[in-house]
């Protein structure tokens, strides 16, 4: 029987604790869409080596990331949850893509340009990141890739590379599309910039109550008094309310902002209470899964085998098309 569902693929790098930007921008969609799609979610450990260069840390982060996925509701009976490195074929495909991609094309990537502008030391892995990402996506024949806005260009790169391959070697790859939800495409951090570990403005998805309290209290505010009307559209605390309050409460808070009468202290207290209520059950689920790491390793191992089998079939086609079968 053929599977009529469209194929979804995405992944997150195991570089430490995921933050609420990763969750609302991408990971939540993995859970919400796992019934509708043939969902394949991976732990991007090859990608993580560009920054995590310590074996113990990388394997710890990898198991941690599997726990994170299970805790937010990824169901391994519905979603193929696997480790990227269980499919070494992606490196082979990445090499083939390297050979049909020009340097100037990769030099136009935002992530590369940002790193260069900050004078960061850029290893070849970081420069070549879009190629490996294209291989992750295309080897699985994916239709859609749920990601945050910052990864949109990389999915477009995967499309461009697929087109180039198809033109050069014959029709082999489907052209994937990024799936980005407008309201969460860029989740802001405590300082109002995009939430990102490199800006030090994150709130961890599995934050403790103390961490939540400290992070929210640290959100900078201006000197407007309680009675003064405030603009919710430019307020950092309100941006978080939109993620953690229900619709009724959001509109009540919005009204009080515009009319005046809601001070920043009270707004922060409401946010802290809502965040704690949202995060506590996730943290508890995570702790429960963490009691059986053997089970986690088995899930990854079994799913890794299945994902590799799917990739293997695609690679047979690719090798034939290229002339290395
Ligand atoms: P990474 O940790 O770079 O592998 O990112 C994992 C996923 O989270 C990607 O789909 C990103 O686009 C998404 N993401 C990261 N930061 C944010 C953010 N601040 N807002 C929305 N999505 C984000």
Task: Go through the PLM ranges and name each one.
Residues 55, 145-148, 172, 227:
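Short, polar/flexible loop-turn hinges at active-site or ligand-entry regions and domain interfaces
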